[in-house]
Amino acid sequence: MRSNPGGLLESSIDISRHFINKGIIVSTVSKDGLKETKKGNGQALTKKPLVVLVNEGSASASEIVSGAIKDNKRGKLVGKKTFGKGLVQSMRTLVDGSGLTVTVAKYLTPNGTDINKSGIIPDIEVKMNINPILQREIGTRKDKQYRAGEKELINIINRKNLISEFNPANTNLNAFLKINKEDKVFSLN
């Protein structure tokens, strides 16, 4: 989502549904106060750990996806605060062929946050390099935000693996506890 200026509301909902099985994705509130809420459809493609890179260039529809991932605790946002364009706009073509963009609603993140003009603060804030990186260096070791996202993803995976190792349903753990219960000793090593 980093440096993604946005797109269509419906597209951002569809993309979010790839990662959010259930739960609110976004709510829109019209100028008349009518609120419409869009949710996951139970057909997420994956439950695997997720880290999303964001920055001040992440706006509008990309903020819908980022907000849905963050508020649903589906993944971590890494980078800089997003742009803060929490508006739904419609393009009208005029008779002379020119266009007019009209704001038709504002949107709220799943937690009800209006991010217009304030943006979304990432879970892990990482400023970019003082000297801009080259296009070919994006997503490489020279990209500080990418490295921070990679590190966080590894941490998430390691935490999940540690938790599953000590799952009470794990028969090896149950056998270990039974043996050590008799000795009244429990090793943390």
PLM feature spans:
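Extracytoplasmic/secreted envelope proteins and their assembly/folding machinery
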Residues: 9-16, 47-50, 62-66, 70, ...
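Gly/Ser/Thr-rich loop/hinge elements
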Residues: 5-60, 87-92, 108
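Short catalytic/ligand-gating loop segments at beta-alpha or beta-beta junctions
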Residues: 32-33, 78-88, 166-167
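Conserved functional hotspot residues or short segments at active or partner-binding sites
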Residues: 113-189
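Flexible glycine-/small-residue-rich
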Residues: 54, 104-106, 128
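Short acidic, Pro/Gly- and aromatic-enriched capping/linker segments at domain boundaries
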Residues: 96, 101-105
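Short, well-structured beta-strand/strand-turn elements
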Residues: 57-59, 72-85
